[in-house]
Amino acid sequence: LPLDNLEGWNDKIFDGSVWPAAGEEWALEVPLGLCDDPVSQSQMPLKISFSENGHHAFCGMIVSGKSTLLQTLFYALIHKYSPEYVNLYGIDFSSHMLSAFEAAPHVGGVIYEDNTEKMEKFFHMMEELMEERKRLFQGGNYSQYVRANGVKVPAVIIAIDNYANFREKTDNKYEDVMMHLAHDGVGYGIFLAVTAGGFGTTEIQTKIGDNIKTVITLQMNDKF
């Protein structure tokens, strides 16, 4: 279902010149389409909220639509929020579908598996950003800072498409940084959105998965 067909979507998006004004309460949430309710045999709008639910994982079997879902996420965020409100980064170890957004003002970059130097610089930058925000927030967290000061620094979303492939191709080089992001990122306004086949030794490992509050499940081979 195209987002344009969702009720109210076109009333609250970029009109070609300005983004809609932010609400009084800080929020970072977008609709992604419809989800099934098997019990009532119906469908309902699917909305995800980073501000309420922190990191997200999108799990499903091969060709279940995980990359398309990440594309929809980027599209929705770019149209609903200004670049001053949210910054996006993509790490695409799948089908390079995030390349469509490289020129968007919100997007700091999309990194592919052969961009080893760019990858190193990115994760170093994220470590520095967490330290910088730790000093800035003075013991508080991102939502508290925004309530007191407004959105002076943007929220950051790091999307990783095909987490298992990312781990394998980088030989788990960035596992420590990922653990830091998973554990402390939400407090600094830095959120993860990762796609995977599920949770486990070769997919999203426990020490990362324990910090992911929300899982959106597409078609699965088996229960995870």
Give, region by region, the residue ranges found by the protein language model.
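Interdomain helical linkers/hinges and coiled-coil/dimerization scaffolds
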Residues: 6-9
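P-loop NTPase catalytic phosphate-binding loop
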Residues: 11, 16-143, 147-223
